[in-house]
Structure formats: structure tokens, C-alpha cells
Amino acid sequence: MIKLCVQYPVEGGSFFDFDYYLDVHLPMSEALLAEYGFLGYEVQHCTTTISGDDPEFLCITQLEFSSLEELREGMQERGAELSADFARYTDIKPIATVTEVIARST
């Protein structure tokens, strides 16, 4: 399994509309990427560090795909459409990293 890990760094003065992100952007992403091996997503709202400091990231989202090839195809075909929606929920430039799941506990 492959994950696209999208991280939104904390930036002073920036905005992030979690309601829009959860209610509009992610369902749109799911619909647009369904035919490209999209399996689901997990959203994490970063609130603090273990030591109680401010977190480095505001939000981390992991989108799961069947394969890297399908992820790449989906981004090639639908990436521009998804990116065009970013400004509706944030002005933060996301950091996207592809990861491969090599172990998982349940």
C-alpha cells in the first residue's frame, strides 16, 4: 500500500478552514481519485508536542492508494483540479511525501 502524506506546516498569520477541508475538499478528492486506486484517508489535527510545545504542523493527511502507479496517474489526471481548490481552505503550501507501508499493527 502507498500513502500520500500531505503536511500543512504551522505558519503565522495563515488560515486553514477545517470545515471546508473535511466537508468539501476531501469528499471531492475521494470522488475524483476513486478510479485511481484510492482506498481512503486519515486526517490528523496537530495540537501539541509531547513536551507541550507548539506543533510543527497544523494538519497531516494521509491518503491511501493501491499502488504508486495509480497515485501518479490520479495526480496527473486530477492533480490540477485538486490543487485549484487549495485556496478555498488554506493559504499554506503543503508538503507532500509518498510513503510505502511496510508494517502495520491493528
Annotated model-derived regions:
Residues 1-106:
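Macromolecular interaction modules
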